[in-house]
Amino acid sequence: MCGIFAQIRRSANLRPPDLKQVSQLLQGVVEQLQQLSDDANALDADLLQESVELARAADLAQQANLLLSGLAGFTALANNAELAAELSAGLSQAENLIPAALENPQLLDALWSIRHDRLQTANKALKLLGSSSQSNTLQCLSEFQLGATLSIQTALSALDRLEVRGRDSAGLSIILPRLETGQLPTSLFSRQYDDQFTNGSVRFSAEAGSRSAPARLQADLATVCFTYKVAATIGKLGDNSQALYRAISADSDLRECLAIAQEHALVLAHTRWASLGEISQANAHPLDSTSASGRPAEVGISRPLVIAAVNGDIDNHSELLANHDLAFPTGVTTDSKVVPLLISKSAHNSDNLAQAFTTAVEQFEGSAALAACSLDNPDKLLLSVFGSGQSLYVGLADDSFVVASEPYGILEQTNKYIRLGGGKDTVKHASEAVTLSTENAGKTEGIANLGSNRTVSEIITAEITTRDVTRGKHAHYLLKEISQSPLSVSKTLQSQASPENVLAELFQGGKVEKIVAIGQGTAAIAAKAFAEI
């Protein structure tokens, strides 16, 4: 398996929240928890969980988290480093007042999200843009710089979570639409000649005519794609995202281009588990449509430059290469490379990008989920799922779409999503393809189904949060699962029984003769332990 992440944004009238209001909400949480602490000795565990103070604290924490979410919340934190530090201190007060035995997911999830999804994300983004401490704010940065930074950091966090699907290599592409070519750093142009599309590679949109004229472009505007990659056979969870973070934060060309951006960036990222093709940066995704023509100038001039990330296998890739007279650059051996190549060729022969995309997808055999973007049309993100066992989750966030291979890849930004792929929540079809547009990003109106007999699936609300899926202090997710087995049993029982039901009476009356504990994998260990109690 592999993991895909993408985010596409639209411009909006941002209304950053007043951090003083957020601070007051957190102070309210502290006051409610202090009152709860005073009453704790007089209340038993059940009454403590159902107390009015706890419900109020949870509501206030959720309000604070909502205000800090999205680009508006991030902008407020970035522009007010001192107030952000005060929020962190107030949050610590609240966290220290939580009773050890407390099990209130609304409160715990909200406080966790404020700490990790809001404050820590803002701090990491500050460093990503070259700010060394909280005293250096991002007040001089535009909405588009901040939006790109938030998308990049969100992608890196998502890659960490998606590593359970594979981690031998990873990559992240940042697509900046329609930059003024006269303002581009001259050092940028030498980075476009890496046909293997490895770490630090840069690509330009086709209309710019980049490779035919080194150090200058033929158009006034050019879409620029920065790509960063890492590949390692041996490593720890989190190593890849840290390597990408270092590469991105050290790229002065990227910072210069972000400074002149007048539109929101599109970010496409991927973590790989190699099934076909060696573990290398050349085989790491995202992949581009550069071919083995020997004259890379032809790609990016006569054909649209396409970037794609793929999860799954294209079984007929060799046949497609032969039939369409395509070839991989030397060193690229992954079957997925055929995806951007064929999409680019189809787009070259069509004025309709969406139709060209479906024309290419309909030729693929196998089982895969894919996300693609043409640099000539950076306002669209193209998605497709075909074959068995594949899904993509399209998150509906504030002014943006967040896409991932698993729900836990989108949770940092939203808990509302639409599922593409197999399952009762989606359209039954051999393949599904949609286009996401910046114009209505974050809204169902921004999702165009490619095919007359397909409809947008219903919106689903996730039942988990980032607190549930974090690896935390554990080196591996397996260790986390084992350590949380007792809690899993407790939560399972709580979801099926309440203190008011007749379960206790059944046990006392001798009506229960047998209890069956069922589990798979590490859950089987919990089931066995439960059976031996």
Where do the PLM segments sit?
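Short helix-loop-beta junction
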Residues: 531-533
